[in-house]
Amino acid sequence: MYDGKPIQIHSGEMHYSRVPAPYWHHRLKMMKAMGLNAVATYVFWNFHETAPGKWDWTTDNHNLKGFLKAASDEGMMVILRPGPYACGEWEFGGYPWWLQKVKGMEIRTYNKPFLDSCRVYINQLAAQVKDFQVTNGGPIVMVQAENEFGSYVDQRKDIPLEAHRKYSAAIRQMLLDGGFNIPMFTSDGSWLFKGGTIEGALPTANGEDNVDNLKKTVNQYHGGVGPYMVAEFYPGWLDHWNEPFQKVSADRVAKQTKKYLDAGVSFNFYMAHGGTNFGFTSGANYTNARNIQPDITSYDYDAPISEAGWVTPKFDAVRSVIKQSVKYAVPAVPQRIPVITPIIKLQNTVGLFDIIESENPVESDTLLTFEDMNQGNGYMLYRRRFNQPISGMMHVPGIADFATVYVNGEKVGELNRLTGKDSLQVSVPFNSTLDILVENLGRINYGARINSNLKGITEPITINDNEITGNWQIYGVPMDKMPVMPKMRSPYVKGQPTLYFGTFELDKVGDTFLDMEKWGKGIVFVNGVNLGRYWKVGPQQTLYLPGCYLHKGQNTVVVFEQLNDEKQTELVGVDTPVLDRLVKE
C-alpha cells in the first residue's frame, strides 16, 4: 500500500557508489524510461567509513543525501539496502577491512565487538537518511535488514540456528533504534527462508521465477499473507577475471517480467544498471576449485542499461513489456552521453623500484599481511637480501592474491591464487635481492570464507622446504591516490613494475573506453580518479572513462603497469567497450 492504495513496485537496482554523481540523474531517467517506478541501492559501509572513525557522506558519489534527492526529483521510490553485510560483488561485502584487526571480533554473528561496530555504522547511516523516509515525505519506502542471511546460515551450520537468529534480530533492532520506521524486509532464495527471515520483516525472494512457489513460501513465513516481491530478479550476472563474460537473453528476461506483472508481484531488477567498480572496490567469490574468483572492474552485469548508460536490446524488450502493462506514462528515452576517442601520449616513466629506494620499509623477521601493515588495498612489496646463494623451488602457499617475483630487479615469474600457482623455481646469487610484489585483488564478499580475508603473504615462504625468516623489508604501496610524477625518470626496464605518466588536451569532453588489450596488468588514474584494474587475461579489455572525469584543456593520466613485458607509448580511447574477450595464456 502507498498512500492507502495498492501499488506494484517495478524497481531496478543501481548503486550510487558505482556511478559518478554527475550521471545519477541520467541513469535514473533511463530507469524511468525503462518503465520502472523505484530504484534499489546498497549502502556499502566501507564506502563511507573510509578509515577507522572517518566518515565521508558528502564528496562526489559518497553523497548519499544527494542521490536520494536525485531519486526524489525524478519521481522514483527508493528501496534502501544498508546491510551491514551487502555482498554485491563489492570489496569484503561492504565491511571495512580493519574489522579483521579488532581483538575478539567475529563478523556476521552475535558478537559484542562486531555488533558495537555495526551499531556505530547504522546510527551514522540513520542520521543521513531517516528524514528521507516516506513517513517524513521522502522517497525511501522500504529498508532491508542484513542480506541473504539464509545463505550464510546454510553455510555456517557450525553456528546454532538460534544464535544466527539472535544476530539477525539484533540488526533489525538497531535499524529500529536508529529511527527507521518504514516497512522492513529480508531477501533470500525461497528455499533458505528458514534461516534468513526475521520476525517483523517481510520475506522477499531472490531469483524466484515460479510465482506460485513465491506466494506459497512467503505465506509460510509471513502469517499466510503477502505482499509478494522478488527482491533480486537477475537480468544478467556477475563476471570474474579469467572466466567468460556472462549473458542472459533479452527474451527470457522480458517473458519473466511479464509473468511478474500479470501476477501482481513486485520485483527489483538486480541489476538494472550496474555501473563500475572504480578503484579497488571490486570483491571476489570463493570456490574450492578456483580458491578465489575476483570480480572484473566493469559491473556491466549484462544489465538492461549498460555500464556507460546505453540502451540495450534487453532494455527495449523490458520497456515494451512494462509499457503494455502499466497505467502510468513511461517517458521517452534520454539521449546517450557523447563519446570521444582520444589518443593519449605517455611522455614519462619511472620504475616502482626506483621510487621505493627513497621509502622507509618496515623491518620484520616474519612476513606481514596488508592488515598487519594497516593497509587495506593496493600492493605490498616484500624484499629480502641474501648474503649466500640459494636456489630451488620457492613455495608461497599464502599468496593473496597475485604476485610478480624478481631477483636483482629481473622478473623471474608470477604467482597466482586464481590458478593455484603458488610455487616457482628461483636462483638467488650471492649478495642478491629477492622482491615479491603482491596485489590484493579484492576481498571475498560472499559465503563462509568471508571470515578468512587477510591479504598479502599470509603463510611462511620456503625455498627447498626451508622457511625463509629474518631480514624482511616490507613496503606498503597502497596506490590510494594518483601518484605525482617525481623529478626522477627511469629508462624502460622490461618486466619491472613501472608508472607511465602523460598529459593530454581536449577541446570537448565525452565518455570513452581505454583500450588496455596491449597492456599487461595494472590500474589507471585519470585526473586523480582510479578507474580500476585491467588485466590482459580478460574478459574485460577496456576501462570505462566517464566524460565527467575529464576537462576541457589539460588532463593527466597515470598508468601503473605491473608486468611491463612490452614498452607502451600511448593510451587509446575507443568508442565501444570490450568486455567479453578472454585471452588464454
Predicted regions and their residues:
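Substrate-binding/catalytic cleft of secreted carbohydrate-active enzymes
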Residues: L80, P84-S117, L125-N268
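Carbohydrate-binding surfaces of carbohydrate-active enzymes
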Residues: L115-V129, N136-Q144, G150-S151, Q155, ...
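Short hydrophobic beta-strand segments in globular cytosolic domains
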Residues: I7, V412-G413, L531-G532
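N-terminal carbohydrate-binding accessory modules
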Residues: M1-A38, K69, V509
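Aromatic-lined ligand-binding clefts that engage carbohydrates, nucleic acids, or primary amines
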Residues: S391-Y406, L434, F504-N527, Y534-W535, ...
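Aromatic-lined substrate-binding rim segments of carbohydrate-active enzymes
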Residues: W24-E91, R172-D177
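Aromatic- and acidic-residue-enriched carbohydrate-binding clefts of CAZyme catalytic domains
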Residues: K5, Y42, F47-W55, D60, ...
